A protein has these predicted regions:
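Polybasic "coupling" helices that flank or enter modular domains
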Residues: 131-197
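Cyclic nucleotide-binding regulatory module and flanking cytosolic helices
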Residues: 1-51, 57-60, 91-92, 97
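Phosphate-/nucleic-acid-contacting segments
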Residues: 173-250
Length: 250
């Protein structure tokens, strides 16, 4: 039987996931308790830049309790392309050959916890329908939508549009977590990392951020960024509604 200290630790580790799930659909006390019971093992701490150990042989999943994680590819000449970001509350999974050529690493100091039981319970075919499973289904749909957005960003948008759209997407995600207030955005990403996400050179990234600042849309600082004009950024992103709403949920 778990003692009070263990239960308190689990609640802190799973709090971002609980908040995010509840932003998609009510999960209730029963759903919250199931989330907390679904995680096992000691939390793992990795410093910024470290690889996140995953075991694809057993489709291991991990919950991001704190910090930011990148998934992407490293080219032979040292260039990187980041294809996805995992924030607190996200669950990452090693899916064998699908991710064989991708790296997963910490962009900041991170804490993760084994989420394999949670992933198996809710993601397997025939999983019991419940308020929690519905929230998880919507969460996974949003994740797939983010991947589609990234493809459109890299394939069809210019640097200005890409940057505006990425910042809006990160703001939307943080509103769901309750960590964004107004236009204030937690952004622990350097310009080099932003360039790796958006497929730009460091020089082009810097010029684009300066242009957004001159247009009084974004005040960028590593660690904390202010989105000064959300409707203006939506217009600058120049994406149709087919790629999903970028106005944060209430």
């Amino acid at each position: 039987m778990k003692n009070q200290s263990d239960a308190g630790l689990e609640a802190r580790l799973t709090a971002p996931l609980e908040i995010m799930l509840a932003s998609f659909a009510p999960i209730g006390i029963e759903g919250r308790d199931l989330v907390r019971r679904s995680f096992s093992g000691a939390p793992q701490h990795q410093p910024s830049g470290a690889a996140i150990p995953m075991d694809p042989e057993r489709n291991q999943a991990r919950l991001v309790a704190s910090g930011w994680i990148a998934r992407g590819a490293m080219l032979n000449d040292g260039r990187r392309q980041i294809i996805g970001l995992s924030l607190p509350g996200d669950v990452i999974v090693a899916s064998g050959s699908v991710d064989a050529d991708l790296l997963v690493w910490a962009l900041t100091d991170v804490v993760t916890v084994d989420a394999t039981a949670f992933w198996t319970t809710l993601s397997e075919p025939g999983a019991q329908v419940s308020p929690l499973s519905e929230a998880w289904r919507r969460c996974r749909t949003a994740e797939r939508l983010r991947m589609a957005r990234q493809v459109v960003r890299l394939g069809r948008l210019n640097a200005y549009e890409r940057t505006a759209h990425l910042l809006l997407e990160l703001h939307e995600r943080q509103v769901r977590l309750g960590t964004a207030r107004g236009g204030a955005l937690h952004l622990p990403l350097t310009q080099d990392v932003l360039a790796d996400i958006l497929g730009l050179s460091a020089v082009h990234m810097n010029r684009t951020l300066q242009q957004l600042r001159r247009n009084v849309l974004v005040d960028y600082r590593t660690g904390r960024t202010l989105l000064q004009d959300l409707p203006g950024l939506v217009q600058a992103a120049n994406l149709s509604a087919v790629c999903g709403p970028l106005i944060p949920p209430p």
